[in-house]
Regions:
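An acidic/histidine-cluster motif and surrounding catalytic segment
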Residues: 1-112, 123-156
């Protein structure tokens, strides 16, 4: 008997703001996991405010300012949860404050910005980065492909 492929996104909201877009984010991130051929994989998405993400940025990256998204990938690629065969990728922290301000700054919806940040964080968990022009081209290309194929356009 074939075992069922289960990918999970676990949400945790550390802010007072209700995040109406959780279901959409779960769908787009599950779509991204499927696109990357991941099986039995999970990770956490944690919504925070600018103060919280500022502290994370300062304490773990020595950068004394807020940012939009920070990821903490588990170093062991074969990390398992509770003895199961489920692989835990790590945590994605998203600043809702920053997502709102960037959506306004870039002239698109909060839904689009939050989706972009979630997918961006997902690719960081997979080891992608954008420190060089070439890395950025690859990572941002993958992100945009997921968002476009899923149906999240820039003007959403």
């Amino acid at each position: 008997m074939e075992s069922e492929i289960v990918n999970r996104v676990i949400f945790n909201n550390l802010t007072e703001e209700k995040v109406e877009e959780e279901k959409l984010l779960e769908e787009v991130l599950t779509f991204a996991m499927k696109k990357e051929k991941l099986e039995n994989t999970s990770f956490d998405v944690i919504f925070v405010d600018n103060n919280y993400i500022h502290e994370l940025n300062k304490n773990y990256r020595n950068i004394d300012r807020e940012t939009d998204v920070i990821t903490f990938a588990l170093e062991d690629d074969d990390s398992v949860i509770n003895g199961s065969s489920e692989r835990m990728l790590g945590d994605i922290y998203i600043s809702l404050d920053k997502a709102h301000s960037q959506a306004e700054e870039y002239g698109h919806s909060f839904k689009r910005e939050l989706s972009f940040l979630a997918v961006h964080g997902f690719y960081h968990l997979l080891g992608y980065d954008h420190m060089t022009e070439e890395e950025e081209k690859i990572m941002f290309g993958k992100q945009e492909e997921v968002l476009q194929e899923f149906g999240i356009k820039k003007e959403v």
